[in-house]
Amino acid sequence: MLHFILVLVGGAIGSGSRYLLSLHITRTYPGTFPYSTFAVNIIGCLLIGIIYGLAERFQLAVHWRLFLATGLCGGFTTFSAFAYENILLLQNGNYTAFTVNTLGSCMFGFTAVFLGVMLTKISI
């Protein structure tokens, strides 16, 4: 139960941080390009890299990994987890899985969003 609470609290902090940062970036850089999402995804990738790097170097306890990586970064952006998992695939020499995961996630993700939007336009 403690692990669940740690992920929950970390997720709340990550989500709140994403919201505040997105507001700031959108106000600072208005326009059609999604600067806030782009920035959040890149910052999240940097954070999860730092967290997992420090976790390995200093044998960080599992509850800290859950709070910081799964909770905080997961609430901030799931793109960071996607990027980290792909790095692991590359490091393990699993190039086929890396390619399938990268291309598949992008293609199916975009397709799923498109289908979701289209489903909202169907008259019942």
From Swiss-Prot:
One of its GO terms (molecular function) is metal ion binding. Keywords: Cell inner membrane, Cell membrane, Ion channel, Ion transport, Membrane, Metal-binding, Sodium, Transmembrane, Transmembrane helix, Transport. The keyword DNA-binding does not apply. Signal peptide: none annotated. It catalyses: fluoride(in) = fluoride(out). It is found in: Cell inner membrane. Its main location: membrane. One of its GO terms (cellular component) is plasma membrane. Na(+) binds at G74, T77. It is a multi-pass membrane protein. It comes from the Bacteria. The chain crosses the membrane at residues 1-21, 35-55, 70-90, 98-118. GO terms for biological process: cellular detoxification of fluoride. Pfam families: CRCB (PF02537). Fluoride-specific ion channel. Important for reducing fluoride concentration in the cell, thus reducing its toxicity. Belongs to the fluoride channel Fluc/FEX (TC 1.A.43) family. This is Fluoride-specific ion channel FluC. The lineage of its organism: Bacteria, Pseudomonadati, Bacteroidota, Cytophagia, Cytophagales.
